Amino acid sequence: MACTLADSLLLFKGSYQKPVLRRDIAARYSPGIFSLNSNGLIQKRFRRQRNFVTRNKVTVIHAVAIPVQPAPVESAEYRKQLAEDYGFRQVGEPLSDDVTLKDVINPLPKEVFEIDDVKAWKSVLISVTSYALGLFMISKAPWYLLPLAWVWTGTAITGFFVIGHDCAHRSFSSNKLVEDIVGTLAFMPLIYPYEPWRFKHDRHHAKTNMLREDTAWHPVWKDEFESTPLLRKAIIYGYGPFRCWMSIAHWLMWHFDLKKFRPSEVPRVKISLACVFAFIAIGWPLIIYKTGIMGWIKFWLMPWLGYHFWMSTFTMVHHTAPYIPFKYSEEWNRAQAQLNGTVHCDYPKWIEILCHDINVHIPHHISPRIPSYNLRAAHKSLQENWGQYLNEASWNWRLMKTIMTVCQVYDKEKSLCCLRRTCP
């Protein structure tokens, strides 16, 4: 599921060449003239040169060469206007097809890939203490301050997810067994099965923004969007007020069905599922026994919903920009998908600390092996070497309003993504 940030066509597969039936006609056309039609779609037009006809012969006046004008997304002025309109600091310049991911990785300092056990366990300490503080705040807060306590606790427990996230990418410790244990324990309070998520998330990184293949993010298909009024309304409301909790649907859909995994993965998946169900079978009754149903809502459910707010919001912001290339596998470019197809966003400092810089997302997609505590140094290097290609933003109301009210619709017949407003 994806959304985009403009009211016009922002992604197109390539210049459309009008079919020419005869060779003598081909000489009368000059390619490279772009225009904007009444629907706001960019199209390539052809200027026909007139033939001067006499009774005896036909003289063809050949076209004068006209420089090809850049598509709007390649225009610095256009990208600057998009950034201003939709809350971005910068909309990245499209990356050339001949750039490889290795070209992007090579300039990164070697130290950003190094694992530091002290820093890794420091992040665990931050998450555990901030979560414990949140539970204490919930226990002591009067009813009118409970929302603030839930916001803090939900954000703190999101840090647990980021720790498990590093473990899954093998960037937490040099010991894989330690990573699997820590990752499983970090995911258990979220009732998120660690191994199923790891398998599916690895595929997301391997096939980022690849149509039909990416397990985390893709546009809505036009035929689905327009198929029936009922389904269209379901998509509209799903992409509207409930969008900040859509990760719950993703969690249910992708991580509990054994048929979605390879036979070699199933044993590890079963272990993770057993751990999650053990937490439900033991943890939930214990919470209810000590605090009652309202205590379960206060101490577990509300922070869990807060976590899913951040899970959904981070994912939406990371993968939404005015120019995100979605392509089929035969046209997909790894460097474009990871550098052009992801977004860096700055949040209030306390959120970045509790969530271990998960918002510094572009270097994480360039190489998932970079530990969370080295992402800022890696991003600084990317800014120095590839700065003009980066999508960057600061979290703001304009950005969130756009993400909540516009979705990206892919038209497979035209091989392009256009934008549909889903909410007023």
Curated annotation (Swiss-Prot):
This is Omega-6 fatty acid desaturase, chloroplastic. GO terms for biological process: unsaturated fatty acid biosynthetic process. It is an enzyme of class 1 (oxidoreductase). CDD domains: Delta12-FADS-like. InterPro entries: FA_desaturase_dom, Fatty_acid_desaturase. The modification N-acetylvaline is found at residue 64. It holds the Pfam family FA_desaturase. It is a peripheral membrane protein. A motif (Histidine box-2) lies at residues 201-205. It is found in: Plastid, Chloroplast membrane. The keyword Membrane applies. Pathway: Lipid metabolism; polyunsaturated fatty acid biosynthesis. Residues 1-63 form a transit peptide. A motif (Histidine box-1) lies at residues 165-169. It comes from Glycine max. PANTHER family: OMEGA-6 FATTY ACID DESATURASE, CHLOROPLASTIC (PTHR32100). It catalyses: a (9Z)-octadecenoyl-containing glycerolipid + 2 reduced [2Fe-2S]-[ferredoxin] + O2 + 2 H(+) = a (9Z,12Z)-octadecadienoyl-containing glycerolipid + 2 oxidized [2Fe-2S]-[ferredoxin] + 2 H2O. Disulfide bonds: none annotated. The histidine box domains may contain the active site and/or be involved in metal ion binding. Chloroplast omega-6 fatty acid desaturase introduces the second double bond in the biosynthesis of 16:3 and 18:3 fatty acids, important constituents of plant membranes. It is thought to use ferredoxin as an electron donor and to act on fatty acids esterified to galactolipids, sulfolipids and phosphatidylglycerol. A motif (Histidine box-3) lies at residues 361-365. One of its GO terms (molecular function) is omega-6 fatty acid desaturase activity. One of its GO terms (cellular component) is chloroplast membrane.
